[in-house]
């Protein structure tokens, strides 16, 4: 069991059935020090930005990240830059990016432009890899980061995605600590769906994650190779958690208690 105490953030993905405003309220009421924010370009307005900025500030919360920018083939999407602008206004430290762009060099170029846009607000653009994206593993993500030529672009590690793409904590040992401004955190069984079953992999990622300590992922080993006390976005996407705790504050409180228990000294 780990003994350190990093900054813990309630990930937006824990609350897919609630608005960003409700997620912030739940985080504040249940004692989380930080929160993640879901950005939906179809519903987010300038009024949303002002309201979220004020809610986060009034609650004394840290906005660890805003998500998600999903890169796709074609020209740059203005909504991606708008997401960064919204994140900057609410004080978000990082913006989460995934990619379905088939050409790695195009992903790298888009990341560079997004990172340049975020730099003025001292935000980090962080690339997350997953089996169901075109950045399918750690090695692909690192290659794209190198191609971007931008040291400010970060790497986001999700323990579930690392395990399901064949990675291990040892694979992270040689990565420059500055590449990882934060990480995600959850548990899961040691073995998941077969790599060929993409639908099942997505289902596990969205609905079957486990509380820290309830699975067999090498979480202690993972934290040992990540930067010391790296902030953690607790990404507990779980249908069981949602069904058990329909109230957002109760859900947030239960997840925080379980996560803190994992970090408590033995």
Label the model's feature ranges:
Residues 67-72, 209-213:
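The substrate-binding groove and active-site-proximal loops of carbohydrate-active enzymes
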Residues 36, 65, 96, 126, ...:
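Conserved beta-strand positions in the central sheet of alpha/beta enzyme cores
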């Amino acid at each position: 069991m780990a003994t350190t105490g990093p900054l813990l953030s309630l990930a937006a993905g824990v609350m897919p059935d609630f608005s960003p405003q409700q997620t912030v309220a739940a985080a504040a009421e249940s004692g989380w020090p930080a929160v993640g924010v879901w950005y939906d370009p179809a519903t987010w307005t300038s009024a949303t930005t002002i309201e979220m900025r004020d809610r986060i500030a009034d609650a004394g919360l840290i906005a660890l990240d805003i998500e998600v920018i999903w890169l796709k083939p074609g020209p740059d999407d203005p909504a991606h830059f708008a997401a960064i602008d919204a994140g900057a206004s609410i004080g978000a430290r990082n913006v989460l990016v995934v990619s379905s762009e088939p050409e790695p060099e195009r992903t790298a170029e888009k990341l560079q432009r997004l990172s340049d846009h975020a730099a003025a607000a001292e935000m980090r653009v962080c690339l997350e890899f997953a089996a169901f994206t075109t950045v399918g593993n750690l090695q692909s993500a690192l290659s794209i980061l190198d191609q971007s030529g931008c040291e400010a672009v970060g790497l986001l590690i999700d323990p579930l995605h690392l395990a399901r793409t064949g990675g291990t904590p040892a694979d992270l040992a040689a990565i420059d600590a500055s590449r990882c401004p934060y990480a995600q955190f959850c548990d899961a069984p040691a073995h998941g769906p077969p790599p060929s079953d993409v639908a099942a992999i997505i289902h596990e990622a969205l609905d079957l994650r486990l509380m820290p300590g309830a699975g067999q992922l090498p979480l202690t080993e993972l934290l040992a190779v990540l930067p010391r006390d790296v902030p953690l976005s607790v990404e507990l996407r779980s249908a069981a958690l949602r069904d058990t705790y329909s109230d957002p504050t109760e859900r947030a409180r239960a997840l925080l208690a379980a996560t803190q228990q994992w970090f408590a000294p033995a």
